[in-house]
Amino acid sequence: MSDTSYKLGITKTFPCNYLPDQQERLLIAVDERLHNSESYGWLMTQGFRRSGDQSYRPSCPNCNACQSIRVLTSDFLPSKSQKRSKKRNSHFIIKQSSQLKDSYYPLFENYINTLHQDGSMYPASFQQFESFLSCNLTQQLFIETWAPANEENGPKEDKLVCVAVTDVLSNGLSAVYTFYHPDYKANGLGVFSILTQLSLSQQMSLPYLYLGYQIDECQKMNYKDRYFPFERFIDGQWLINTKPSVNKAKIAK
């Protein structure tokens, strides 16, 4: 596909949602030939992401802080804190669905309206839920985490506490979005969901888990380089990183 030319669009600049005093601009895959599973997978290798069926990549005039990251699944080694996360959450029941269920919406709404009141998706709406998470470009998996019934201080019946929206590509899985019940925030279900996606990637013999954009200067977007080894998309190349820096090593303990 690299020898073919495609039509791309570019947005106007607008205030960045992640870095104050920065202006954001997006490159959009508008060519109809890119609106299929094979092309979407190729776009992911070029640093793109998706929102609904729209594939995009940051193309900001004065900033290149957003850098796509993918974990090398076969070589992944969990840190001590990631091992603790797996142990702490080992009682949960994991299920999978291939469909975006309407029954997920109350959980999504609670997550957005409780934990992300400062975000661009607040307040949550069902239309936003559908348009953002559904996708016709590729196969999807919805990884469900359930709290089992009859535990001490637990629910009276199995309770859905987290959904990890995941795209299936020819060379990996892509972590699109994860939302969870605010009462379970202390469980670190975001980390646990990534670990579950990594395990599933390994089971499916897929070499990569795409985690989205790492933004070092943004606290809520700088966690994605804690899963080693990973590759980071910089200046059109995937550059491998196998060891944490001193600061990251301290965070991972």
Swiss-Prot record:
Q: Which GO terms describe its molecular function?
A: arginyl-tRNA--protein transferase activity; leucyl-tRNA--protein transferase activity
UniProt-listed InterPro entries: Acyl_CoA_acyltransferase (IPR016181), Asp_Glu_LeuTrfase (IPR017138), N-end_Aminoacyl_Trfase (IPR030700), N-end_Aminoacyl_Trfase_C (IPR007472), N-end_Aminoacyl_Trfase_N (IPR007471)
Is Cytoplasm set as a keyword in this record?
yes
- What's one GO-annotated cellular component? cytoplasm
Note the NCBIfam families from the entry: PRK01305.1-3, PRK01305.2-2, PRK01305.2-3
Q: Which family does it belong to?
A: Belongs to the R-transferase family. Bpt subfamily.
| Record's protein name | Aspartate/glutamate leucyltransferase
Native species of this protein? Colwellia psychrerythraea (strain 34H / ATCC BAA-681) (Vibrio psychroerythus)
Which gene name belongs to this protein? bpt
